[in-house]
Amino acid sequence: MTETLPTPVLDTAQARVLGCLIEKEATTPDAYPLTVNAAQVAANQKTAREPVLTLQTGKVHHALRQLETLGLVRQQFSSRAERYEHRLGSALDLTRQQVAVIGLLLLRGPQTLGELFARSERLARFNDSDDVRHHLERLIQRGLAVQLPRASGQREDRYAHLLSGELDLDALQAAAARAAPSARSGADSSELEARVLSLETTVAELQDALSALQARLDAAGA
């Protein structure tokens, strides 16, 4: 798959599973590539996921096989268990930073530059938010991401991936408007966001440790 080929259109399960493979490659390298069970655990995490999903094992397995057909995932053959790794970077000729940005957008939906920069720490190195913007602009040029119009009450631009096709902008703006803080000052909002991101990182690290343990248990029981 090269730049001249059309962008794959992923369904909800495929997008979530692909995002999980991107995330876990960086955060739990000892447990990567992922087994089907580990991919399911990652897909159904209650933290660092928007929306929270409950995907059954069969659905996750089917999504992995479909992603494999699209050339975005490759199965690693093992005598103990099926394992899968993503090939997004090579399939679409993306840098590590661009893969990280796409992964975050797949897992957490539309986000601001600040959110992407803060949440990318464990996935890829960015110098600052402007560096994130640079890679986003490249993705936008490729038709893989888009800058969203600001909804009422929003102070910053948000970005979304286009691997699942065209977006329902009206629905996204309505959801963003409902979520926008109405009475909190800008300073208070920034401080709260920083605290939330710190807590999310801590919880995500704990979740990664559990995923690694699950992968070892899968291997031992296979």
From Swiss-Prot:
User: What HAMAP family does its record include?
Assistant: UPF0502
Q: Which domain of life is it from?
A: Bacteria
Family label: Belongs to the UPF0502 family.
Q: Give the signal peptide range.
A: none
Which InterPro entries does this chain map to?
A: DUF480 (IPR007432), WH-like_DNA-bd_sf (IPR036388), WH_DNA-bd_sf (IPR036390)
Coiled-coil residue windows: none
Would you tell me the protein name for this molecule? UPF0502 protein XCC4136
- Per its UniProt record, what Pfam families does this chain match? DUF480 (PF04337)
